From Swiss-Prot:
Xref: PANTHER family: ZINC FINGER PROTEIN 831 (PTHR47166:SF1)
Gene: ZNF831
Residue spans of biased composition, Gly residues class: 376-385
Name of the protein this chain belongs to: Zinc finger protein 831
Keyword Zinc-finger: yes
Pfam families, alphabetized: zf-C2H2
């Protein structure tokens, strides 16, 4: 034991020097976790540090390797010191270098800790064992074998203790804690940790910083000694930890004990900095090292501190343990081997290494060794560490050690009880894995998760927590991990302020935590700011709300508790818990745990809680109960899908918690809810909460951050009364409901809530909505609550999105700053914008829609609230939301009911249009959005962008109608339909189509689904009916679209609701955007942004363009108006996304349209659709772009933003849900035409305004812009080879971007990822796809149309009618956007629709239908696509980009190749685009050009295929997911890609969408897609002969696209269109505008089929191979 003596002192000394090697230490610390630094440290530490690192990373191999080289040199050094050869004293080598310390110090700073850990293992495994006294002990290996597990114990005592782990015997009870331990040493440790912790905690809380310090003070009474002892113990502990790593089960507990003990020791030094200083004095470098350490990774700091204080070491060890944990299971054997071979007598440690009880024995041994060390090493530590007060220290250490050992023993026993469980063993690694994933806070979760199990229980709670919180608090969340480990060092060295807190075991930080609590509210913004720093939701939350939480957890229990209380101050329970823990950790834990369970988190985290029980539940439960749990749950709900436990928690916990929270919110009452929400914010946003209205942003962030919470937040908001909040929620619900998931809500809430604050209350009348909302609400709430329940596609998608995004957001996710952080930041940003945008963005889209609904319902409301209609709308929405205390429900209701309401008011929609002053306001919103968008976190929260701002403006041109269209994709389709209906004959009429608008609003709402397009048309007429139906049959909507135009409205209405779920419907509702926002909002950003502003994606981008657009189309103009805003908003999103700006001009409209609708859809059919191709269309990017914008943006901002934005987009794709119903997407489709309607009166004329007019122009505009925008988002095939052909078989457009199209299509395939979100919609898309214009060349126009087409679902039918061209454009767009978004659904529907080869009744779809289809399809697709993109991002498989890509390709590809990555390639080869005016394919040119148009730009002004596509699109838009691809190379590809992406939301599922079956023949008769069903689509090419020739146009495109699209049925993602469809888009433009026949060697023999009168066939051949990579790239992005 001589060695131990020197070892004890030596390590401190060494540790002291260690600080100097802070850099090495830092690397070491990092290396430890990463294992990369191991080698780095190795040289510096002479191999010691590396072993440590290795111990953590690869304890067995590396350790072994390192020790021999590194340790042997030490062996000589250690030899003298390590006479005792105690295992713990392998640290001796580290200590030994004390002399060389200064020199070595530079290197071994990390080694100190490393050495401690290494000391244990090295002695065990390397030559050190033999070199030191280990050999003898090693020789004993095998002597004492455990009869149960065969573990080799060096000593009988060890074996005895080890056996207890098997038998469960716990002969050493702790009277104080009532815990029995297997070993006396554990009991001692426990006393030192748990009992002392409790006492210390009590005293600490009572004394403040003094308590913990005093407790330690007892030990600190002999500062050097406690320190020495702490070090000695630490070293022993380190060894224990090292060995413990050997056994995963034991390792953690041992670590916990070590940590606890160390923590105790640390507090000693902490309380008495003198202690630290003394050692530091001994090793002057330590002081500098500390500062360095603070800078450096936590690991080094703890190492530095380890000499100074056991706590740092403990932290380090913990760290190591956490690091090791991941491979703990594997390591144990190796460790065991090591331990067995060279355990330096600590086979007990090896024992401890043994999974279950190893901790006890090792700890006991450790304790014994510590005692020995103290006895023998006590003097050493005195001189070695501080060289002073060895006797006093020794005495103090003895007592301390005894207590510590008791505590540790108890702790270990308790932990073992947990740890020994196989369950716990399994759990721990899982947790670690999650932590490692950076789920919550790598540092905190990572550390305390692992520690939780053991550390938190006793020592950790009090001590570690103290440092942890400080570190967390002071360090940004992103630094959270380092902070945690840094906690002491960072606090000590980096943050002096922190240091006292850190040192003060709990109270300082407790108070600090409270202080933080207060600051947190304000700080929430900061927190949010910080949060964004951390992509992960967990870290963000930990950082922000978890700023306290992480800090809390790490800090001493009191501190943690208090902090938790601070965080959970709002919730209250946590606070109580926080306070309680000081007194009774166990009781507190229990209470906290119970509270947790009550919260519903228990359900999600039952097992975890049990584990939590072991580790301080105060940390997890008190903090986690309200805060921590919430955070994690939110994370789970959020983008963070990575954390299964969390997800589970979210699933059950969230559902429980959500409802509970909702209940709490409800119970709390408005105010309480508000408070609660604030707490949530606190939890989520930390600082956001404080600001009531500022808070909303936080709130939003909160919502976003914690989808789970968002549900409750929403509820809170609703209850919170803050109508604004509610509205925010509602808005978000509409736009934010998704938002909750996405975080779109943030903006919505903030803007809505904020702006609406005042009138949110008035909107309280929203009860009106409330009632309505109530009905729908269930849908949202459920899904939302469910998180993954998918009770409502919308909600589900939202949740999913949130999870993903967040997780999205995951994130997401990404997120991934922690979604929390990111979201918070976003929220902050949003906050910025929200305030301006609030009403405008949110209200316009969501509130406005509701307002519009409300307004319409409460007609006076809009007027009442001048703020407008917008305000009114918002009010309404808000009231809706407000009334729906269950904001989620409200949101749903708003969305859903909204549509109904809207339906009613919509009819009054005329008033609604007036209301749509809201629209006017929306422009303001757009401005706000603009700011918002810019401000708004481009990422996840971009969703906010679509806050109907743009849509509002859009509505301006459209009048209410556009607003309505804007309202949501869903709404839009209706709107579009309405437009179409209204302006069917009069393309522009729709713009003024206030009348239709109302109807449309309803229609849109209803129509949003697929049907809406037709319905929209008729819906305008059916307005009221539609509203009703929309709300009712959203699902039907999807099919409806193809249904009769007249009925469709109603039918659509029904489907829209389902599709939009809430948002579409709501979009339709008063504010299309709003609803759409809801819809898209559902999709979160999408609906919200989409709905409200053009924000959805493209719209944002179009900020600038919209103005241009605005002029272009009356409708367009308005669109543009909003567009600018929209662009801003979308910009946020789009910008974030990629701002496919080339498309901006058209885009704005597109964006507007899209935004209005689903942004993507909206865009598609946005004005520019008509405009670009046509004058009006010129500025507008297409809806396609919108789609792409959603999809394409992904690439640009993609991953990170993709997660966030993407998710947001996805929400629009939530639309997945949207798409699912396709209502939203369809709605988008509707919008498509709407936009087009706006986009081109001329276009309308050209297109007859069927949705396509705007769409088409939009489409056209979109094409180029799409190309620009898409790429960033979906990697539109636009011209970029990156065409993200995610699923496209024809990887490359051989010829031109037909391949692009294909790729888009592939993208669409990729959509499947989204599909899962909104699976049900996929089929609808299908039709669209096939609808692809035969002459994709014309696809330009087709593309435009197609892009518009996304709206086709809603409006294709209507637009289709007269506006062949438009339809064509729409179709194309639709095709392009045809999104497999709801892959699953799509697949499902595909099956339905697959069968349904749309009859090639040119006449039938030839007109309206086709167009309608196209529009719907396009829009839907866009929606879907966007969604898909977003979804994709969230869903890796989805490759949301895919969609964009497809669309891009579509662009490039043009209609000719409407490759459907999905099996349903657009067979709509022909869309008799009756674009006589298609000649005005200026846009087309661009699109083509941009698309790298192989296809002649001018080629087909009218894409027959496009038209066909339109028809089909309409059909498919809904069904197939709006394959825009067909329609336009750009659009088509994009749309299709998007659709595909969307549809294939599930890679595999989505692919199924391959069904290329136009759900409704009506829409696209020509889609003769032999969809072999979702899956079968894989191989079957869609032979869609879209003989959609619009007789009216005189040109019927007989384009036949035989696309052998081998659907990768299951591989939705890579569904390559096997033979890209040869798109023989034969477009016989009325004007013989030669559709360029793109002669492409059909890589896959494309079946040319001329459908009736296919004048020109554009044969597009896609080369799968070539493009694949690019596609893939896109996908990757």
């Amino acid at each position: 034991m001589e060695v131990p003596e020197p070892t004890c002192p030596a390590p401190p000394a060494r540790d002291q020097p260690a600080p100097t090697p802070g850099p090495p230490g830092a690397p070491g610390g990092q290396a430890s976790p990463h294992l990369t630094l191991g080698p780095v440290l190795l040289p510096p530490e002479q191999g010691l540090a590396p072993p440590t690192v290795f111990l953590k990373a690869l304890p067995i191999p590396l350790y072994h390797t390192v020790p021999p080289g590194g340790l042997q040199p030490r062996a000589p050094l250690v030899t003298g010191s390590l006479d005792g050869g105690n295992v713990p004293f392998i640290l001796s080598p580290v200590l030994q270098p004390e002399g060389p310390g200064p020199t070595q110090v530079g290197k071994p700073a990390a080694p100190t800790l490393t050495v401690n850990i290494v000391g244990t293992l090295p002695v065990l495994s390397p030559g050190l064992g033999p070199t030191l006294g280990s050999p003898g002990k090693v020789r004993n290996a095998g002597k004492y074998l455990c009869p149960h597990c065969g573990r080799d114990c060096l000593k009988p005592s060890v074996l005895e203790k080890h056996i207890r782990s098997h038998t469960g015997e716990r002969p050493f009870p702790c009277a104080t804690c009532g815990i029995a331990f297997k070993t006396q040493s554990n009991l001692y440790k426990h006393r030192r940790t748990q009992t002392h912790l409790n006492n210390s905690r009590l005293s600490s809380e009572s004394e403040g910083a003094g308590g913990g310090l005093l407790e330690e003070g007892d030990k600190a009474g002999e500062p050097p000694r406690p320190e020495g002892r702490g070090e000695s113990r630490c070293q022993g502990m380190h060894e224990g930890a090292s060995e413990r790593p050997l056994s995963p089960g034991a390792h953690v507990p041992l670590l916990a004990k070590n940590l606890d003990v160390r923590t105790e020791a640390a507090p000693c030094p902490g309380s008495a900095f003198a202690d630290r200083e003394a050692p530091w004095d001994s090793a002057p470098m330590a002081s500098p090292g500390l500062p360095a350490a603070s800078t450096q990774p936590w690991r080094k700091l703890p190492e530095q501190k380890s000499p100074t204080a056991g706590k740092p070491c403990a932290l380090q060890r913990q760290q190591a343990t956490a690091a090791e944990k991941p491979w703990d299971a594997k390591a144990p054997e190796g460790r065991l081997r090591k331990c067995e071979s060279t355990d330096s007598g600590y086979l007990s440690r090896s024992d401890s290494a043994e999974q279950p009880h190893a901790p006890c024995s090792p700890l006991h041994s450790l304790s014994e060794h510590s005692a020995e060390s103290e006895g023998e090493g006590g003097p050493g530590p005195g001189p070695g560490v501080a060289g002073a007060e060895p006797g006093a220290r020794e005495a103090g250490l003895e007592l301390e050690k005894k207590r510590l050992e008791e505590r540790i023993a108890q702790l270990i026993s308790h932990n073992q009880a947990v740890v020994d469980d196989a369950q716990l063993d399994n759990v721990r690694p899982r947790k670690t894995g999650l932590s490692k994933q950076g789920s919550i806070d790598l540092p905190t979760p990572y550390t305390y998760k692992d520690s939780f199990h053991f550390d938190i229980r006793a020592l950790e709670p009090g001590r570690r927590r103290a440092p942890g919180p400080v570190r967390s608090t002071w360090t940004p969340p992103d630094k959270s991990r380092p902070l945690f480990f840094h906690s002491v060092p960072t606090q000590l060295s980096t943050t002096v302020e922190c240091v006292p807190v850190t040192r003060s075991n709990s109270l300082p930080f407790v108070e600090g935590s409270r202080t933080w609590l207060e600051p947190r509210e304000p700080r929430d913004p900061w927190s949010r700011t910080q949060k964004p720093l951390s992509p992960r939701p967990g870290p963000a939350r930990l950082g922000c709300r978890s700023g306290l939480s992480s800090t809390d957890v790490p800090s001493g229990h009191p501190r943690a508790l208090v902090r938790q209380a601070a965080v959970e101050d709002l919730p209250g329970t946590p606070i109580g818990d926080a306070l309680v823990p000081a007194e009774d950790t166990d009781a507190k834990r229990t209470a906290a745990r119970e509270a947790m369970a009550g919260k519903g988190r228990a359900g999600g985290r039952k097992c975890g809680q049990r584990r939590l029980k072991m580790f301080s539940q105060e940390k997890w439960q008190v903090y986690g109960d309200e805060t921590f749990k919430r955070i994690y749950q939110k994370m789970k709900a959020s983008p963070h899908g990575g954390k299964k436990a969390r997800e589970v928690g979210m699933g059950s916990g969230a559902e429980l918690g959500f409802p509970l929270q909702k209940e709490a919110a409800g119970s709390s009452g408005t105010v309480p809810t508000q408070d609660r929400r604030t707490p949530v914010h606190e939890d989520i946003s930390a600082g956001a909460t404080p600001e009531p209205w500022g808070n909303p942003p936080a709130l939003e962030a909160s919502l976003v951050t914690e989808p789970t919470k968002h549900g409750e937040t929403v509820a809170r908001r609703g209850d919170s009364d803050r109508p604004r909040v509610e509205e925010a929620v509602s808005s978000p619900a509409l736009g934010g409901r998704d938002s909750p998931c996405s975080g779109s809500r943030s903006p919505l809430v903030s803007p809505n809530g904020r702006l609406e604050l005042g009138w949110q209350m008035p909107p309280a009348p929203g009860p009106l909505k409330g009632g309505d909302v109530e009905a729908p609400r269930p849908v949202w709430p459920d899904p939302k609550l469910e998180g993954g329940a998918r009770g409502v596609g919308d909600v589900q998608e939202t949740c999913l999105w949130a999870q993903t995004v967040l997780r999205w957001p995951s994130r997401g996710s990404g997120e991934d700053k922690l979604p929390s952080e990111r979201k918070k930041l976003k929220v902050e940003d949003l906050h910025s914008w929200k305030q301006p945008e609030p009403v405008s963005a949110e209200t316009p889209g969501g509130p406005t829609q509701p307002a519009s609904l409300s307004s319409q319902k409460q007609d006076a409301d809009p007027g009442e609230v001048p703020g407008g209609s917008k305000e009114s709308a918002r009010q309404v929405g808000e009231p809706l939301e407000s009334s729906g205390a269950s904001l989620a429900a409200a949101s749903v209701a708003l969305k859903r009911v909204g549509p109904r309401d809207k339906a009613t008011p919509l009819h009054p929609a005329a008033p609604a249009p007036a209301e749509h002053p809201s629209l006017a306001t929306p422009p303001q919103a757009p401005r706000v959005l603009s700011a918002l968008a810019d401000n708004a976190f481009s990422p996840k929260y971009l969703l906010r962008l679509p806050q109907a701002e743009t849509p509002l403006p859009l509505p301006i041109p459209w009048g209410p109608r556009h607003s309505q269209d804007s309202l949501c994709s869903s709404g839009w389709p209706e709107e579009r339909a309405s437009f179409v209906g209204s302006g069917l004959g009069t393309p522009l009429s729709p713009s003024p189509a206030s009348g239709p608008s109302p109807g449309e609003a309803d229609s849109i709402l209803e129509d949003p689904s697929c049907s809406r397009p037709q319905d929209g048309r008729k819906g305008a007429q059916l307005g009221g009916d539609k509203g009703d139906r929309m709300a009712t049959s959203r699902p039907a909507a999807r099919e409806l679209p193809i249904s009769a135009p007249g009925a469709p409205r109603e039918a659509t209405s029904s489907p829209p609701t389902p599709t939009c779920e809430a948002h579409l419907v709501q979009d339709m509702e008063g504010d299309s955007h709003r609803i759409h926002r809801l819809c898209m909002g559902s999709t979160l950003a999408r609906a919200r942004l989409s709905g409200d502003v053009l924000n959805p994606w493209v719209p944002n981008w179009e900020l600038g363009e919209p103005p241009g657009n605005a002029p272009e189309d009356p409708s367009s103009g308005p669109l543009v108006g909003p567009d600018p805003c929209s662009p801003l908003q979308p910009g946020s999103f789009l910008t974030a996304l990629t701002r496919p700006q080339g498309v901006p001009p058209g885009w704005p409209e597109l964006a507007l349209s899209s935004h209005s609708g689903t942004s993507r859809s909206h865009s598609t059919r946005s004005p520019h659709s008509t405009q670009n191709p046509f004058p009006s269309l010129k500025a507008e990017p297409r809806l396609t772009w919108c789609c792409l914008s959603r999809s394409v943006p992904l690439p640009a901002e993609q991953k990170a933003k993709a997660a966030s934005v993407y998710l947001a987009v996805h929400f629009p794709g939530s639309s997945l849900r949207d798409e699912g119903p396709n209502g939203p997407p369809g709605s988008n489709g509707g919008w498509t035409w709407t936009s087009p309607g706006e986009g081109g009166p001329a276009q309308m004329s050209k297109f007859s305004y069927p949705t396509v007019p705007g769409v088409m122009p939009q489409h056209q505009v979109s094409e180029p812009e799409w190309k620009k925008g898409l790429p960033w988002r979906a990697k539109m095939s636009r011209g970029n080879s990156k065409q993200r052909k995610l699923k496209i078989n024809p990887k490359r457009y051989k010829g031109n971007f037909l391949q692009s199209c294909v790729q888009l299509r592939a993208s669409r395939l990729r959509t499947p990822t989204w599909v899962r979100r909104r699976s049900r919609h996929p089929p609808a898309l299908e039709g669209l796809k096939p609808c692809r214009t035969p002459g994709q060349t014309s696809s330009e126009i087709a593309g435009l149309n197609l892009q518009e087409e996304p709206s086709c679902a809603t409006s294709e039918s209507p637009p289709c009618c007269g506006k062949e061209e438009k339809k064509e454009g729409d179709c194309r767009q639709t095709l392009g956007t045809l999104s497999l978004g709801t892959s699953s659904r799509i697949v499902r529907e595909m099956d339905k629709r697959t069968v349904k080869d749309i009859s090639p009744s040119a006449g039938e779809h030839g007109d309206c239908t086709t167009h309608s289809t196209a529009a719907t399809s396009g829009l839907s697709l866009q929606s879907d696509t966007c969604l898909a993109v977003v979804n994709d991002v969230p869903l890796p498989p989805g490759k949301g980009l895919d969609l964009g890509l497809l669309e891009t390709q579509l662009l490039a590809s043009q209609d000719s190749v409407s490759t459907d990555p999905k099996p349903y390639i657009f067979s709509d080869a022909q869309r008799p685009s009756s674009f006589g005016s298609k000649g005005t394919f200026p846009h087309h040119d661009i699109a083509t050009s941009v698309a790298a148009v192989c296809i002649s730009l001018p080629v087909r002004t009218d894409h027959i295929a496009q038209e066909i596509h339109s028809a089909e699109s309409r059909d498919h838009s809904q069904t197939a997911g709006r394959t825009l691809t067909s329609s336009s190379p750009d659009s088509k590809v994009t749309e299709e890609g998007r659709a595909q992406t969307l549809l294939p939301g599930r890679p595999s599922s989505g692919q199924r969408i391959s069904d290329s079956v136009p759900l409704e023949s009506t829409e696209k008769t020509h889609l003769e897609i032999p969809a072999s069903g979702p899956s079968s689509a894989s191989s079957h090419h869609k032979e869609g002969r879209h003989k959609t020739f619009f007789p009216s146009r005189g040109q019927y495109g007989c384009g036949e696209m035989t696309v052998p699209c081998p659907s990768l049925g299951s591989d939705g993602r890579k569904r390559q269109v096997s033979g890209l469809i040869t798109r023989k888009d034969s477009v016989v433009p009325s004007k013989p505008e030669q559709p360029i026949e793109i002669p492409e060697a059909p890589s896959k023999s494309l079946k040319k089929r001329s459908l009736e009168g296919m004048r020109k066939q554009t044969r597009v051949e896609f080369s799968d191979t070539s493009s694949d990579d690019e596609d893939r790239l896109v996908i990757e992005i």
